Amino acid sequence: MGRLGGALGLALQTKRWPVRIHSRTNEGRERAESLGLKTAAPADLKRARVILLCVPDAAVPAVAQALSTTLPRTAALVHTAGALSLDALGTAKGRSRGSFHPLCAVSSPRDSLVGSTVAVSTPSRTLREVLRHMAADAGLRVIEVPEAHRAAYHAGAVLSAGGLVSLADAAVAALGAAGIPPTDALAALLPLMHSALRGLETRGLAGGLTGPIVRGDSGVVAAHLEALPADVAPLYRLLSRRALGLAGDRLEPTSRAALERLLKPSG
């Protein structure tokens, strides 16, 4: 049993859902029991209405295939992977399939899911209502993701989390060019990043924008491009062009034109 399975299990058990955890390993069963979650033997799965596959993405097809050979068609299969289509659960007629992907980083099974969002996808109206009820009881906000656009949705999720870490790495490299050690650089940048996220939360994308782009300060931007490491400058250009779009009509035409010239992709 992994961290997400534990977190979902605890959240739903608190709301009196009849949760059972099935794990192939003694270690997984012991982890579930240590959290106060009840475990299920393979035979118990035949009585389940909904089975959530909280397994690594690569394991979903094989696990779904193994379950499909033993479960009645009345048991719905639901994976928790962000990028996988429902076809990863098999294509047997008569079985409801769905996905339930919480948009949160779960570092411990005891982490609260309250306030996060979950992406739900299923062609079954009945299963959709069950998953929405499940989300509400876990304190999750629901968005529905069309199956055809799952890759774009998941890419956006990755950009907001792993992409943010990569952006922090680039910022640390920029401070490194000024002679600041990586540990000190990250410690200096984290409060700034937190304040930027708070501004984003309270004022939205355009309102949360700060820095030389929104001020139209092409001189500062030119100095930045001159000083940045060669592998960071292209990222700075790309993100600054996005910032130009967010700045909108707050920039005077002459300032915008000067920035656009500076921010053209090099080469």
What are these regions (language model features)?
Residues 18-23, 77-80, 118:
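Short, hydrophobic beta-strand segments that form beta-sheet elements in well-ordered domains
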Residues 1-47:
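NAD(P)+-binding Rossmann beta1-loop-alpha1 motif at the extreme N-terminus of oxidoreductases
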Residues 18-20, 96, 141:
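Residues at the starts of beta-strands that form the adenosine-phosphate
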Residues 198-255, 267:
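Interdomain hinge/lid region at the active-site interface
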Residues 26-29, 39-111:
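Rossmann-like NAD(P)(H) cofactor-binding subdomain of soluble oxidoreductases
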Residues 31-33, 94, 111-202:
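Internal alpha-helical scaffold of NAD(P)-dependent oxidoreductase catalytic cores
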Residues 31, 104, 250-267:
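Short, basic/aromatic-enriched C-terminal tail that caps enzymatic domains
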